[in-house]
Regions:
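Glycine- and aromatic-enriched membrane alpha-helices
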Residues: 1-456
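Positively charged, small/polar-rich N-terminal and surface patches that mediate targeting and assembly
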Residues: 401-405, 420-579
Length: 579
């Protein structure tokens, strides 16, 4: 007799874990550059769609088809008897639940190898992960294999899912090599900021939400007081560890970099979730607190280590989130387990080193197996299909070359142009931010004016001038109002990109100084004849002035001829209804 409550709960968990694919897709897309967004979305879609039939083909059988020490059994298309699992839910419900876990392990790899991986190669190694790599590791820990018989404990996958995916992510990123431009000739890292942290943050929120199904659903039961109590503890510990890790990462980066790092803090949330996954059923809330605390610091130090010392280019921090904290979470069971649901209590709860030793042994053996198998697979792929795309493809972006997609954002702006600005510092501050109090020298420094040289040989002053104004987009409304007040009613406005470099600009991304960044600006062009050029220039300078170098620049050109298409009027007459 199946339990309807347990069946529904397991299905809800499976559906939530499936929706993690959306979270991973948004997170990875936001942490990478816009020219590769379509490729990121395609990979996150296809690793699940490829993994599902592969896991059905032989993966589930290898994982749960028997109680052998090393593998379950060879059972193509799941035709065998699985009564030894002792399920009180339908087998197909359990298969769905395990399938989405398998897909999660495969999708972790996408982030660390982003922006330079051959799409065909990605499809092949995603299939390999779902066919043999994840199922065999999963059998050792969950399917009755040798680690499970020794008392190895991994409730929902810090080791089986995140550590396995993280090890593959680390190996793949190392074998691929860094993205073009990531390191200079001396090996110093350059920051390559993600193009949309809004999408990245939404992805993290989705993942956090779905993690209640990932961990909570792993109980497979809500039919007794004991299982309901355990599931409640699992969900509470999951949330607590993630929240603590997020706070710790924010504070740690604030102290370390001078400002709280947004992308690192988002990684901190995921680090806490990964770390608590192994022991969420067996640690107390105090244990969850300390697990999250360590995870929040570990993820920052790990990102810095792989970025600056190991020189492994991981665009989204997948290695630090999933590998480093998967390892930490698995070890933490041996430290903080209260003895509930584990063979031995943790070291800090009087259980000695027994559980800790088992956890360490399991990690070493699982990681060794994964590295050996995936190294062979990556090498075969590299020699046949090619693991990495050519340099010109990487530079142009994978979207256009791999998928024929000009832009994943066709018709939409992808920058928050209203807030983007160079950070003021001691080298740019002019000492006065009130335009009414600013001196002429300060005004000229903030908004320089460049006039076309007067040429006398064959060129005369027509009395008509083009004034071209380059300014921050956020200042457009003030500039437009100032020009309208002068009587200028016709203007051409163009959105452009530009930058200025001032020594000492304190921009950092994930602890690495950011190089020159193109920022959204506007170019406003007006043609004047009746209105004084000097009046236009002064009005523009007052509208744009903030007290810092880089407020804008004004160019003044002599105009030799103007023709109005509608009436045929020329020069001065052609301008009278647009001023």
């Amino acid at each position: 007799m199946f339990s309807s409550v347990n069946t529904c709960w397991t299905l809800v968990g499976a559906f939530l874990v499936y929706f993690m694919q959306a979270g991973f897709a948004l997170c990875e897309a936001g942490f990478t550059r816009a020219k590769n967004t379509g490729n990121i979305l395609m990979k996150n879609m296809m690793d699940f769609c490829i993994g599902t039939p592969c896991y059905w083909l032989i993966g589930f059988g290898l994982m749960f088809g028997g109680t052998g020490a090393l593998i379950g059994g060879f059972d193509p298309f799941i035709q065998g008897d699985y009564s030894h699992l002792g399920l009180d839910i339908p087998l197909w419900v359990y298969i769905v639940f395990q399938t989405v876990f398998c897909a999660t392990a495969a999708t972790i790899v996408s982030g660390s190898m982003a922006e330079r991986t051959n799409f065909k190669a990605y499809c092949v190694y995603s299939a390999a992960i779902s066919l043999v790599v994840y199922p065999i590791c999963g059998h050792w820990m969950w399917g009755g294999g040798w680690l499970q018989s020794m008392g190895f404990h991994d409730f929902a996958g810090s080791a089986a899912v995140h550590n396995v995916g993280g090890v593959i992510a680390l190996l793949g990123a190392w074998m691929l090599g860094p993205r073009i431009g990531k390191y200079d000739k001396d090996g110093n890292p350059h920051a390559i900021p993600g193009h949309n942290l809004t999408a990245g943050a939404l992805g993290v929120f989705i993942l956090w939400f779905c993690w209640f199904g990932f961990n909570g659903g792993s109980s497979l039961s809500l039919s007794t007081d004991a299982t309901m109590t355990m599931t409640g503890l699992v969900c509470f510990n999951t949330n607590l560890a993630a929240a603590v890790a997020t706070c710790v990462t924010m504070i740690f980066t604030w102290l370390r970099y001078g400002k709280p790092d947004v992308s690192m803090t988002l990684n901190g949330s995921l680090a806490g979730l990964v770390a608590i996954t192994a022991g969420c059923d067996t640690v107390s809330p105090f244990g969850a607190f300390f697990i999250g605390f360590v995870a929040g610091i570990l993820v920052v130090l790990s990102v810095e280590f792989f970025d600056k010392i190991a020189r492994v280019d991981d665009p989204v921090g997948a290695v630090s989130v999933h590998f480093a904290n998967g390892v930490w979470g698995t070890i933490a069971v041996g430290l903080f387990s209260t003895g509930s649901n584990t063979a031995h209590a943790g070291l800090f709860y009087g259980g000695g080193l027994a559980q800790l030793g088992t956890q360490l042994l399991g990690l070493v053996c699982v990681d060794a197996y994964v590295v050996i198998v995936m190294f062979i697979i990556f090498k075969i792929i590299d020699k046949t299909l090619g693991l990495r795309v050519p340099a010109e493809v990487e530079i142009d972006g994978l979207d256009i070359h791999e998928h024929g997609l000009a832009s994943a954002y066709a018709g939409f702006a992808i920058s928050d142009a209203n807030s983007a600005a160079m950070t003021p510092n001691e080298n740019t501050d002019l000492g006065e931010d009130d335009v009414t109090m600013a001196t002429a020298k300060q005004m000229d420094a903030a908004v320089p004016v460049v006039r076309e040289p007067v040429i006398h040989d064959g060129v005369y002053d027509t009395g008509m001038h083009k004034v071209s104004i380059i300014a921050k987009l956020a200042k457009f409304d003030q500039l437009k109002t100032a020009l309208n007040d002068l009587g200028v009613t016709g203007m051409t406005v163009t959105q452009i990109m530009g930058c200025g470099i001032q020594k000492g600009t304190p921009e950092k991304y994930r602890g690495v100084p950011v190089d020159t960044t193109l920022l959204p600006k506007i170019k406003v062009e007006v043609i004047v004849s009746r209105i004084s050029v000097d009046a236009v220039v002064e009005a523009a300078k007052k509208a744009l002035y903030t007290g810092h170098i880089g407020d804008g620049k004004i160019f003044v050109y002599n105009v030799t001829r103007v023709v109005k298409i509608r009436t045929g009027e020329e020069d001065y007459a052609a301008l009278q209804d647009v001023e």
